[in-house]
């Protein structure tokens, strides 16, 4: 069972409704939830909220992050610009679980316009319950973090 119990969530205007539901769901599961916004459906810039989530992880205030926008793609692109962040855009439970087990992802990005609420909850549950295996997977992560030597 995963012991990482502090989760930071952020969203833009296209993901705010699902983010709020995920916050409540994760609290019910016993997680400490940090909600960095947005709190409105007024148009806003998703990189602002990706930065807030990534900075919260970088300072050690949270163990895992969740970003929600329309598709999850823009958030994942923005989040992966930050040192130490391994963000994956997932639309199914298998990918969400394996990105933790094999890629040691610390941020999952999902799309409110892509997923229904039930599937979104299942994806997040798969992500937060999985743990990194290490071993050969750590070697591969080191390769993309430090560059590949041929």
Which residue stretches match the model-derived regions?
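Mid-chain, well-packed structural core segment of small domains
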Residues: 67-113
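Short, structured active-site "lid" loops
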Residues: 49-67, 71
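Charged helix-capping and loop-helix junction motifs
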Residues: 48-51, 90-92
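A short beta-strand-loop structural module common to alpha/beta enzyme folds
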Residues: 32-43
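Short, solvent-exposed amphipathic alpha-helices that sit
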Residues: 17-28
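Short active-site oxyanion
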Residues: 6-7, 61-65, 84-86
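C-terminal binding/interaction regions
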Residues: 2-10, 14-15, 93-150
